[in-house]
Amino acid sequence: MCIRDSFTDMGMEITNEAIQVFGGYGYTKDQGIEQLFRDNRITPIYEGTNSVQAIDFVFRKISQKKVFENFMKYVDTEIQNCSKVDNLNEHVKKISELKNILSDFTDWISPNGNTPKDDISASCNDYLRFFGYFCLSFIWLKTMRKSYENLENNKEFYEDKLNTGNYYFDKILPRAESHYKSAISGSKYTMSAKFN
């Protein structure tokens, strides 16, 4: 679920950027970018919107600790495999740090814990986004390990994979921590909003 939501959010971001790249011309029907944007716009709404999915993820899925624990064991195994590849040491260190943050974040947001329910509810979107960025970093780490293992078989193809993975770690993944910081700030101002 968190991967699907991450892709739908990123799809919106990417098609929006594509319109911007084309300038006013991207807004016309000539290039098809506006159609891609319109087609993409529905994806965050499918299955009850990403925000509803975030609430469901936290209150139903994450509260079942076993699923989270099994996923973390799987991540640990891949981290061990990747730590044997010298070129991935920096990324292994980063994903290990984020794994610790994700564990703390999960304990904090767990409906079974001590965090007030309003704080949890106000933080579901941030948790889902953090989890999505983390999962994508895990997938990129695994992809990069496989790319290094097969580099000589198809150098150009795997170098592109490695470059894209490095880009993700350097330019996209740092967004994750902002969602953690936003979430743990609580819900005081979110819940004090008055709608007249």
Over which residues does each language-model region extend?
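Acidic, Mg2+-coordinating active-site segments of isoprenoid diphosphate-utilizing enzymes
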Residues: 32, 44-78, 144-147
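Conserved phosphate/anionic-ligand binding catalytic regions in large, soluble enzymes, centered on
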Residues: 9-28, 36-59, 128-138
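Acidic/polar loop patches that form or flank catalytic/metal-binding clefts of enzymes
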Residues: 15, 19-28, 67-72, 80, ...
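Short linear motifs at secondary-structure transitions and domain/linker junctions
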Residues: 19-21, 33, 111-115
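Alpha-helix initiation and N-capping motif
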Residues: 12-15, 30, 39, 51-55, ...
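Short, small-residue-biased leader/transition segments that mark boundaries at the very start
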Residues: 1-3
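C-terminal amphipathic alpha-helical interaction region
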Residues: 74, 78-196
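Alpha-helix capping and helix-loop boundary segments enriched in small/acidic/polar residues
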Residues: 5-6, 24-31, 45-49, 62-66, ...
